[in-house]
From Swiss-Prot:
InterPro entries: UPF0295. The keyword rRNA processing does not apply. It is found in: Cell membrane. It comes from the Bacteria. One of its GO terms (cellular component) is plasma membrane. The keyword Iron-sulfur does not apply. Belongs to the UPF0295 family. Its main location: membrane. It comes from Bacillus cereus (strain ZK / E33L). It holds the Pfam family DUF2614. This is UPF0295 protein BCE33L0445.
């Protein structure tokens, strides 16, 4: 079974989307505690904070996305954005690198760490 690669921007967007649903679910749980106003308010506030956190994450990844390098994927010929030295295509999940020293090597996320020396 091969490893499934995923684009970093898509991973962060998926995390932000999951924060929205988790926040709504937590806030909805507060409805079951209508008798105790403190618990109900706590659940609703925590859910609201999760939704606000997702907004912050979406804003952050949007700003980060404007600074990324756009390249054309050699496999699907579609434009994709790269974060770091290695990343995956947003459309076909093809492993990509712009570092000549890493061409032909096995795809690994550790190449993006500052402590890694090629």
């Amino acid at each position: 079974m091969s490893i499934k690669y995923s684009n970093k921007i898509n991973k962060i967007r998926t995390f932000a989307l999951s924060l929205v649903f988790i926040g709504l679910f937590i806030a909805y749980l507060g409805v079951f505690f209508r008798e105790n106003i403190i618990i109900m308010t706590t659940f609703m506030m925590v859910g609201f904070l999760a939704v606000i956190a997702s907004t912050v994450v979406y804003f952050w990844i949007g700003m980060l996305s404007t600074k990324t390098v756009q390249i054309i994927c050699p496999s699907c010929d579609k434009p994709t954005k790269m974060l770091g030295r290695v990343d995956a295509c947003m459309h076909c999940n093809q492993p990509l690198t712009m570092d000549r020293n890493l061409e032909g090597k096995e795809f690994d996320e550790k190449y993006n760490k500052k402590s890694y020396k090629a």
